[in-house]
């Protein structure tokens, strides 16, 4: 493992990287938020179904 080479590679990537524009950031935030809400809603539906069915779940 060549540490100086690895560090130079990381520095080169960080120099090429740029911060996203406000529009890009908002779009990514909305998509990530929608995904989190979708997963939460699916989990809630599973919990509700398991709670309503007799003999299934705790």
Swiss-Prot record:
BP GO annotations: intracellular protein transmembrane transport; protein secretion; protein targeting
This entry's Gene Ontology molecular function terms read: protein transmembrane transporter activity
Residues spanning the membrane:
36-56
Q: GO terms for CC?
A: plasma membrane
**Could you tell me which InterPro entries the record lists for this protein?**
Prot_translocase_SecE_dom_sf, Translocase_Sec61-g, Translocase_SecE/Sec61-g
Question: Where is the protein localized?
Answer: Cell membrane
List the membrane topology term(s). Single-pass membrane protein
**Where does the protein principally reside?**
membrane
Provide this UniProt record's keywords sorted from A to Z: Cell membrane, Membrane, Protein transport, Translocation, Transmembrane, Transmembrane helix, Transport
Q: What does this protein do?
A: Essential subunit of the Sec protein translocation channel SecYEG. Clamps together the 2 halves of SecY. May contact the channel plug during translocation.
Subunit structure as annotated in this protein's UniProt entry: Component of the Sec protein translocase complex. Heterotrimer consisting of SecY (alpha), SecG (beta) and SecE (gamma) subunits. The heterotrimers can form oligomers, although 1 heterotrimer is thought to be able to translocate proteins. Interacts with the ribosome. May interact with SecDF, and other proteins may be involved.
- Family recorded in the similarity comment: Belongs to the SecE/SEC61-gamma family.
**HAMAP family, alphabetized:** SecE
This one is known as Protein translocase subunit SecE
Species name for this entry? Halorubrum lacusprofundi (strain ATCC 49239 / DSM 5036 / JCM 8891 / ACAM 34)
- Gene symbol? secE
């Amino acid at each position: 493992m060549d540490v100086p080479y690895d560090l130079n590679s990381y520095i080169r990537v960080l120099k090429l990287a740029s911060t996203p524009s406000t529009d890009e950031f908002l779009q990514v935030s909305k998509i990530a938020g929608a995904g989190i809400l979708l997963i939460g809603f699916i989990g809630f539906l599973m919990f509700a179904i398991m709670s309503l069915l007799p003999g299934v779940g705790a």
